[in-house]
Amino acid sequence: MNIIEGAITAPHANVAIIVSRFNSFINDSLLSGALDALQRQGLVKESNITVVRCPGAYELPLLAQQLAKKGSYDAIIALGSVIRGGTPHFEYVAGECNKGLAQIALEHQIPVAFGVLTVDSIEQAIERAGTKMGNKGAEAALSALEMINVLAEIEP
């Protein structure tokens, strides 16, 4: 049996992080977690990390597409938070963001890590941005690094 697994270290990787400004009090914690994981666990050099900000989670797929088209990055990490309110807006934004990012990963054959919180309350967002439930930004960063290495193992 042949088992292919990817390491989480990728010292020569070029990584783009796209982060939404809306709900920045949450997203800045996700970004800090992602940067920490990339540098401390992934051994990625700070000079190999590009951070791009956008207005909200809905805009993340367009940024991811443009960065993927450049061909300069080994992975893209999308960070943001969509908090449910009293209108259907949550479903529209969360759904389109998710679908858009997944489509870009498939079309461009590049890891696009999904670090966008889709939660019912601010409390749930805070829990997932570095308190009780860990930091989903760090988890997305580690997922991106692992996928870089897994894809390198299976490419012809």
From Swiss-Prot:
Pathway: Cofactor biosynthesis; riboflavin biosynthesis; riboflavin from 2-hydroxy-3-oxobutyl phosphate and 5-amino-6-(D-ribitylamino)uracil: step 1/2. The active site is at residue 89. It catalyses: (2S)-2-hydroxy-3-oxobutyl phosphate + 5-amino-6-(D-ribitylamino)uracil = 6,7-dimethyl-8-(1-D-ribityl)lumazine + phosphate + 2 H2O + H(+). Pfam families: DMRL_synthase. Keywords: Riboflavin biosynthesis, Transferase. Its EC number is 2.5.1.78. It comes from the Bacteria. (2S)-2-hydroxy-3-oxobutyl phosphate binds at residues 86-87, 128. GO terms for biological process: riboflavin biosynthetic process. One of its GO terms (molecular function) is 6,7-dimethyl-8-ribityllumazine synthase activity. Gene3D superfamilies: Lumazine/riboflavin synthase (3.40.50.960). PANTHER family: 6,7-DIMETHYL-8-RIBITYLLUMAZINE SYNTHASE, 6,7-DIMETHYL-8-RIBITYLLUMAZINE SYNTHASE DMRL SYNTHASE LUMAZINE SYNTHASE. This is 6,7-dimethyl-8-ribityllumazine synthase. The gene is ribH.
